[in-house]
């Protein structure tokens, strides 16, 4: 399989684990918080949905508009695996940037899932149809430890971010006080 096939498979895989983790939850389960400073399933799902569109726009409006610079490829070698590892490590907490912070008034399950599915479909369609080489366009991640990423790695970041917060949803569901129904 090509790199693009791998990216699509990863996006489809993270979509499935997220949908499986949120399937069939009651309103009480959806809004349950293990502690006042912890996110509910609703807040995690909304953050995933908002982030998907935000990062996709960053890829299409900023990363892909940077001039192709194949000479920069050495800067990002080995970061594919690093992105996946870093994002799945839940021992390192991060604070969501204000536009992606769901704490105001969480969306309903239907709203979050609809937004997520629409955004994910656009991301997958872009990967399948763009004629540009995703490995030739670069943009710096705001977290210095991550640094410069190519467009392909930004796509991996979308999927890894979904998986990270799906793990967070599973943590919420594993809480002993999580409603039985």
Regions found by a protein language model. Give the residues of each.
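Acidic/histidine-rich alpha-helical segments that form the ligand environment
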Residues: 10, 80-134
């Amino acid at each position: 399989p090509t790199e693009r096939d791998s990216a699509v498979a990863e996006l489809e895989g993270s979509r499935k684990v997220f949908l499986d983790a949120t399937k069939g939850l009651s309103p009480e389960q959806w809004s349950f918080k293990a502690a006042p400073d912890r996110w509910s399933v609703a807040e995690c799902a909304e953050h995933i949905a908002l982030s998907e569109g935000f990062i996709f726009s960053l890829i299409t409006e900023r990363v892909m508009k940077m001039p192709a610079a194949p000479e920069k490829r050495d800067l990002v070698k080995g970061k594919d695996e690093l992105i996946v590892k870093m994002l799945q490590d839940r021992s390192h907490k991060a604070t969501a940037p204000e536009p992606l912070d769901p704490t105001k008034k969480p969306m309903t399950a239907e709203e979050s899932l609809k937004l997520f599915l629409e955004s994910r479909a656009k991301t997958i369609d872009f990967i399948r149809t763009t004629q540009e080489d995703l490995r030739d366009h670069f943009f710096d991640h705001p977290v210095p430890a991550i640094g410069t990423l190519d467009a392909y790695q930004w796509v991996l970041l979308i999927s890894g971010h979904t998986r990270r917060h799906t793990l967070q949803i599973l943590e919420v569901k594993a809480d002993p006080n999580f409603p039985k129904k």
